[in-house]
Swiss-Prot record, chain B:
Compartments in which it is found: Cytoplasm, Cytoskeleton, Flagellum axoneme; Cytoplasm, Cytoskeleton, Cilium axoneme; Dynein axonemal particle
Keyword Repeat annotated: yes
Protein role: Plays a critical role in the assembly of axonemal dynein complex. Plays a key role in ciliary motility.
Record protein name field: Dynein axonemal intermediate chain 4
Species assigned in the record: Danio rerio
Gene responsible for this protein: dnai4
Assigned keywords, A-Z: Cell projection, Cilium, Cytoplasm, Cytoskeleton, Flagellum, Repeat, WD repeat
SUPFAM superfamilies tied to this protein: WD40 repeat-like
Amino acid sequence: MKEYCAATRTHGGRSTPDLSDMAEVEDTLKRIQAQHGVIGTIVVNGEGIPIRTTLDNSTSVQYAGLLHQLTMKARSAVRDIDPQNELTFLRIRSKKHEIMVAPDKEYLLIAIQNPSE
Amino acid sequence: MSNTTVTQKRRTLKVAKSSKTLNVSSGVFRPNQSTTKSINPLFSGKSFGSTGDSKVVDKISAQTPKHTAMVVDENGQDVTPHPLYNPDPGVLQSKQGKVFTALDTSLTTMTEFPSIAFQTTNASLTGPFTRSFFGSASASRISQTAESVTDETKDLLVKQDLSNSISDIQSHREEPKEQLRENILDSTANCYLSETETIWLLDIPAVSVSVESEDAEAVKERNNAYTELCKNRQGNDKYVERSMQTFSDASKTKEVQCDSITMVDKAVMCTVWDMYDSFNNISDVSANTVVSSERHEATIPESSSEGHLVHPKRSNQSLSVVSTVSTVSGSSTHIEKMACVLPLDEEPDLQLILQSDKLKQDLALMERVVLANVFQPKLAAYRQLPIIEDPDCVQMVMEEESWTEQSKNSHCPFLERLWDFSCELTMGRNVSCMVWNKKNPDLLAVGYGQVEFKNPNSGLVCCWSLKNPTWPDRVFHCESGVTALDFSASNANQLAVGMYDGTIAIYNVQTSEQTPITDSSDCANLHTSPVWQLTWIDHEDGLAADKGEILVSVSSDGRISKWIHYKSMECVDLMKLKIHDLQWKRHISSLTPGMCFDFHPNDSKIYLVGTEEGHIHKCSSSYNEQYLESYKAHKRPVYKVTWSPFCSDVFLSCSSDWTIQLWRQDLQIPVMGFTSGQRVVFDIMWSPHCATVFGAVSEGKVEIWDLRVSSLDPTLVNWTSPGVNPTALLFSPETDCVLVGDSEGQVTVYKLKNITAGGGSQGETLEDVIQSTLSSQH
């Protein structure tokens, strides 16, 4: 006999928070990397150091530095127009690639994709 | 008196040069019209004209002779005042005018003034008057010696000089002009002179008072009193004239050195959001920041202008930034302390980021964005949007061309495969049911579970989103195979799941929790056999308790039950499916298993039930004893029965006896039957767009029937790969796409091409078809 009630959500759902979260994050990163045409994914921490990357170190650091500055500028532009607004996503489409950046206060999530492959 | 040296010239041209004598009746005139401008200190603007019987010579009119003037009074005596001092030979003398002959006392006092004035006025005079000729005049003044004068008169003299000098300049200017014109003396030239408004450049009240004024007596008395006083105090020590001189000692150089003043360049970029943040953060500022708001603003932008993120405590480089800020704000000291501690803790920082919820959301978003790039043309086709070609991708264009060419060539309907929902979780599982979310048409719930008893394995419910065809948004693992699904319409996040062991669970798809909200395991009346179909029905009963949605299920134990869940699920039987046909009478129970049911789209009380014995019964939910009607045509279990969405009388049924039957609810025998091959038909569905179109899945193929075209053959047949059976069919309510679930766990999305909806009322079209069929039968 199982006892269920409406408040089951509060317990039992997240039994092992850290491990399952980490696994979920890793899984999602792997799936993104495995998608068609994705060249690399980088997770950069607040200091500009890549903490998860599928590219080589020098490229990762270069991307991290450049995109961080651009994201700051973009965020500044968005908030200048309306201070209650916030930048949520940034996409740069170039001739060869598309760079997608999801910014946050503590990290930067970057994915580079070549959609034409 | 032509020999008089008074060569005062009148301003008017009529006056001959030589014959000019100044008409001085009382000796009041302006003697000092020399270019070197002698100052008549006694004249001020006011006092000049105050002498009663003196004929006032206009300041301007008098011309200054180049040589020294002689003053002659009315008696012809030479009363030219002697200059107090003799200037340098090179400098022209300036004369002092003896204006008030009668005022000796005043004169004596006055005469002391000018010299002082000369010295002191040089600076002030050169100020307002920058004309070059006047510069020479001031030089001559400076050269005159000064005598000590009381301060108050000095100032007055200065001002007097200014006013006098104005006239001097003006007269000097006039002189060259006059000399030119004398040549044309004979001709009368009319010259209209007008006087401008008096421009007061300086106005010093007079210290000299005219003899004839009212105060003269008082002034005289005061002057006398003063002289008396001076005389009395001759020997008094307090009244001794003294002069002082300051010694200027020898100068000595002294060197001082101070610490180098460090110059720091500070730049702040003031942005709108920065001000907004600071304004909002003032209220949030903790006890750390004791600082004023200006400093608070200063710390935040400077860290951002350095190019770091707003969290300076995490940045090693920002340490240097903070240290150079000499404004020791409370927040910066706090940050310095933090920065000292943190560089050691790099690992937890990493973990924190990787576990944050925001990162998960961003990852999901990123995944969708990446997939949107990959699937863009397919999704556009799904949503019936024009497919935009990427100008940078040449390869894709070529593929597209070959693709579209094929479709253009053929005008017959065909299914264009867009994509399929599948992932490693679902591989190998049998798709048993699919249902769209009522509120979000992009959300699809697919149930995976076996339909036979062969391989009992755990079931799976996946909620797929159109935006991510590679991985389901939600995955719910169930204990037994899932056989029925339905989303609630009123609470769009509730998904009812019916399982092979008869359990019904309600999941909340908003969270990814694996436990359902409620479960029917506790219910006493729970189904003991697989639940083949579930529907949420909007009940319009009068009782308040029954209002809203209720869940109805049909199961192989022969019961149609209505489930109410407050705290736990309870069910009430709507109908028990009694066996009609003796042939099918079972010994175990008197009920025949129900396989499917469908509520009438317009009337939620009437519903059809398909049973395992092949009968279809029309029942009413308010009458649970007897069937309203029975339709008997199928020989084998009826797998699906469905009302037409356009015609309220027409319904369709499919069975494992290889046939699909079209019924009208008033006729006991089916109007039309469809069969194509000897294959079990698993699922059928009316097209939500076209009344005469329905789809069917049978072993190995997907068929689309269009009754306008033909009722004998399907209009479209799509064969699946060998070994794979399509087991579920779902039309998309928004677009013209069909979803087919198969026994390998794939849900493929096809786009229906070249099937036109047709004009006219949909229901009428179908009815026409039926009518024509009926008439042709008789």
